[in-house]
Amino acid sequence: MAHFRSEYRALVRAALREHARFADFTILKVWPGSIDAATLPVLGVLTPQDRCEQETMTSTSRRTLLQVAARRAGHDEVEDVLDADSEIIEAVVNAAIRGAGISCFLDETSVVSNTLGERHVGTLVMTFRLTLWCAPATLPDDTEPTTP
């Protein structure tokens, strides 16, 4: 069974890949520090932070920060295009995560633009807060004898 953060990333990547707006995007599993213009547009899904709080002796809440980053080239309207991307990303992420029975809300959106050669490049980062209630992590039961 995959770790829950791995499942979040895979679920969101798959949902974004299925949406027509992002058909020409490269969806990265790892967000590199720099991306060349030939690779754009790109999307990345990251889970950089997870907070665990023990609710009871048998229950914890896992609050995970999930980020979706999009980078695309454009002209002076690149931020407007990213704003339109953000509406769709929010809807896709909410549908995918909530459809899996996990609490999800958009916490923050940031857009940064700069110039790469003669083109403008914009980066959108959307931060979602996901909450999962689950049992604390345990080790597998090793009481079964192993056969050599």
How would you label these PLM feature ranges?
Residues 1-35, 47-148:
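Charged, amphipathic alpha-helical segments and their flanking helix caps
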